[in-house]
């Protein structure tokens, strides 16, 4: 979550501009981008490792946005690119498939993109759209969001301003 009223305003305004730009850029059907800034862990690591074990790294180009790419030397000579947030704009705009885990990118996916927010748990507190102080912003920057169980769909729909079936 972006803290501070003005930082949030700049963040979401920039996201609107990038969302428009994204519609103009063709998507690569063989490109996958993981936005896991804090690192490959929990759900991001599980999905990433599954894709590696199943051989997706050959036919697909896989980009991982992490804080410290040097932590992942084992992927250096594979079909995986580890990169910082500063170098991630092009992969984010070109990828057909986007995966993130709560560290939202304020860019709306286009009709030619599939964006999955595999949220890391169930919120026990108010988050995003549930908090009045965060203002009237959209938080549904994904095509789908995962919930730990059907009982939590309503909570996610309220928090992210999305439909329960997303």
Roles of regions detected by a PLM:
Residues 1-36:
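Membrane-proximal basic amphipathic "stem/tether" segments
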Residues 31-166:
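Active-site and donor-binding regions of nucleotide-sugar-utilizing enzymes
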């Amino acid at each position: 979550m972006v803290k501070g009223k003005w930082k949030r305003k700049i963040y979401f305004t920039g996201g609107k501009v990038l969302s428009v730009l994204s519609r103009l850029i063709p998507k690569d059907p063989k490109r996958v981008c993981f936005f896991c800034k804090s690192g490959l862990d929990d759900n991001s690591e599980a999905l990433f490792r599954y894709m590696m074990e199943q051989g997706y790294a050959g036919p697909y180009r896989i980009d991982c946005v992490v804080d410290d790419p040097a932590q992942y030397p084992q992927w250096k000579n594979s079909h995986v690119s580890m990169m910082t947030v500063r170098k991630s704009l092009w992969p984010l705009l070109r990828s057909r498939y986007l995966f993130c885990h709560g560290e939202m990118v304020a860019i709306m996916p286009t009709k030619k993109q599939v964006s999955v927010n595999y949220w890391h748990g169930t919120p026990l507190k108010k988050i995003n759209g549930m908090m009045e102080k965060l203002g009237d912003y959209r938080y549904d920057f994904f095509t789908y969001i995962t919930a730990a169980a059907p009982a939590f769909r309503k909570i996610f729909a309220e928090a992210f301003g999305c439909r329960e079936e997303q």
